[in-house]
Amino acid sequence: MKHFFLALFLLCNVMVQAQQIDLSGIWHFAIDRNNVGIAEKWYERLLPEEVSLPGSTMTNGKGDPVNVDTKWTASMIDSTFYTADRYARYRHPDNFKVSFFLQPDKYYAGVAWYQREVTIPAEWKDKVINLFLERCHWESRIWIDGREAGMQNTLSAPQEYDLTELLAPGKHLISIRVDNRVREINPGVDAHSVTDHTQGNWNGIVGSMYLEAKPEVCIERVDVYPLLSKKELKLKLNVANHEEQSIQTDLVFRLEGSETVHSYTLQSGNNGLEVTLPLSEKIAYWDEFHPNLYDLTVTLQAQNVGTDTKTVTFGCREWEVKDGAIYLNGRPAFMRGTLHCAAFPLTGYPSTNKEEWLRELRICQSYGINHIRFHSWCPPEAAFQAADELGMYFQVECSAWAAVGDGLPVDSFLYAEAAAIVKAYGNHPSFCMMAYGNEPGGKKQKEWLSAFVTYWKSQDNRRMYTSSAGWPNLPESDFLIHAQPRIQGWGAGLTSIINAEEPSTSYDWSGYTLNFNQPFISHEIGQWCAYPNYKEMQKYTGVYKARNFEIFQATLQENGLIHLADSFLLASGKLQNLCYKADIEAALRTPKLGGFQLLGLNDFPGQCTALVGALDVFWEEKGYATATDYSRFCNSLVPLARMKKLVYENNETFAADVEVANYRDELVHPEISWRVKDALGKVLRQGTLTADKLNIGNCQQVGSISFDLNDIQQAARLNLEVSVNGTINDWNFWVYPSRKVEEVNKGILLTDRLNREALNQLKKGGKVLLSLRKGTLSKEFGGDIAIGFSSIFWNTAMTKGQAPHTLGILCNPSHPALSAFPTEYHSDYQWWDAMSHSGAISYAGLSENIHPIVHVIDDWFTNRPLALVFEVKVGKGKLLVSGIDFHQDMESRPAARQLLYSLKQYMKSDAFRPDTEISVEIINQLITDQI
């Protein structure tokens, strides 16, 4: 980042900086539980308790212990916590733990009073005095010495009060009444600005807080509009003249060594001024690659009044939408976004420290992210400062997830909130997009949102506007955000492409995006879950505790699986990473797609617990995904391979079409190479592809790869790696020897039930492979568990049991049963067939001593012991039980044939020695249609 300096001065005789009184520290405090403080004039007496500000009731240990009667600010999407027997012990006051979000020790939603004395210095006489409260949550009312000064209720911007008439030099009592209830103005109890699902509905003031004295003629506002096509800088200034008469001023504009002097007469009251300055021919543009910043200093002096100075940081950047694409500074741009859902488990509120935001945003950048969508909230000034320095593109929302257009108070509140946001943060180049909020309701939402977007486009054209995240798609919007272009949607279940269709990397969303003229950004893609990381619980040292994790961990312990907790995390995490790679690459393959917004790069703590992140809620790694790995497929330059299949037989020909998504610089004669390696890293095939130039954009085809597989004589996991100028992406694929069904079925008896033949075989001490047909597993033993290839979407509690209900497989890759079926310890695409033709066997009712060869990782709410494959003794015989259907359509299932072959080879060997004995009667209970 570079800073360039531009100074605008109003001529003056004396330079005196604005003066401030810091109000942070100890304040008197009282909770006004019954809302009687105004009637009883609490602002006239000293409050009895003390708290530290900046801070909240929670950080100060104030409020009520949480229990079943706590009135949360949130929709209770899943009420089973309050009704289900399994949660009864956690509803007891002495052991109260909620399962649906992080839990504070104390909670308070209502009125609280904050009060302190302040001494105004004599030199502030005849000054304009303002009170500045950053991140006051939510509604504030101010009294000075018993006289009310006003009310403000912005959730997003600083609350500022003009106290000039109330603060003469001397001692004064400031009383602040803060009310964090959701009342007439309802932004939605699930809006991340207020909801207990994320940051929590805290009460307090958590940012900068001070009194500021300024001269009676002072700068209220400076808005900077870079007009890059004209190489001009337009300034809009609001200068307040608190004198009763007009004032003469001179303005000197100094830019890159040149000066221009103008004279102005400022009338009493507010004065709007517009000034246009020339920019140099060589503009230092701002974007993700070159976040160049300019500092504009405005200094004002009116004769006999004093000086006022304001410094504004801005960047020279210009957004444009044309031909269905997003352009930044004249070049195509692609939003690789993630949501920021306002989860702050240590404090319960957003940091106003730039260093913390630099930490989070740098982590995002290391994972290839260039864009943050602030879901139904707006971050504080420090976040914008950090994003300006790093070149991060922000989508800001007006703190709502609400019904709009119904004539309720929230309608006018949203216009006011948008105005406050634009005023406070409008100069930041990182403030790139704005929407009303998230997924609106309301019968007249389209009409209202159309007017909202139209109004703001006319008021301030420095950014792009859209109606809302999620819907509706309106012609007035500069760009659209919709959930259609993604792999898994709400209600899709096992019909999504990753669950219903054989693995490939050839699909995209052009069938949807090409129907619209505006650029499209995919809404909340991903939502793929991993198993909880119970070691994370020790990180919750602040106001929130992960009591939900404690509940889940206890269930795992009771089901005898606690020793597998870390393995479940890592294996499910690898599957989660695979699903995100599929989602992101599909987006990068799609024409006319302007970007995506992940949900998310880090975990979401509420809405029944959605462990959707490669990172935890603290933005820290969980152990299964690194920035290096993730940024191979999520970056400004990504090689892509379209492969119609990922599982081959060795009598087939491997084929891949290579293309590139390039949003860096144009690449002339790029070096493009590919190679295929085996599991040991040995290079089996390699080659080069040619392209004269790679433009900025996606869907740039650079060639095809094709070769016969007949020299692959044993089952193998291979890896295709494509490099563009040293930037690498890669994909696993599998090659199996071509085997006929008849060949695989020889030897070991394969049956779908313990019929007479199977029983006779077992009685003689023989070996039997019991493969349950899809749909025949009894409900008591897992038949009601919807199993699929992908990870769980969001979570099963909030989605009311949306399939799949499981998190992939866990196995020992070195187990001899899998010696002819190359695998790692987790799901990969070679397991798609097995998972798509199987049931998860809940084996707890069979025996305590079963040790599955292949585990299925259950939903963390239930933590049932589940198996895909296990072995037992039945009398003298040996039985391998498979939840995988090895009967149906085996001719078209090469992965199933290879897995069956591997299992049978194991059963033929001396290594097949099950030691857990189960009766025939118990085994028969697995199947619903015994005859």
Cite the ranges covered by each PLM segment.
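Extracytoplasmic/secreted cell-surface and envelope-processing proteins
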Residues: A382-A383, A403-G405, K443-Q445, S771, ...
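Ligand-binding grooves and catalytic loops that recognize ribose/phosphate and carbohydrate rings
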Residues: D406-Y425, L769-H826
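Secreted/periplasmic carbohydrate-active enzymes, especially glycoside hydrolases
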Residues: M1-L11, V16-F374, C432-M433, L449, ...
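Short beta->alpha connector loops at strand-helix junctions that form conserved
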Residues: N153, E165, H375-S376, V396-S399, ...
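Short alpha-beta junction capping motif
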Residues: K746-I792, K876, L903
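Short, solvent-exposed loop/turn segments at secondary-structure junctions
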Residues: H28, H137, R181, P472-N473, ...
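Substrate-binding/catalytic cleft of secreted carbohydrate-active enzymes
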Residues: L361, H371-L615
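Catalytic beta-strand/loop cores that center a nucleophilic Ser/Cys/Thr
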Residues: L777-S778, N795-P894, F912-I931
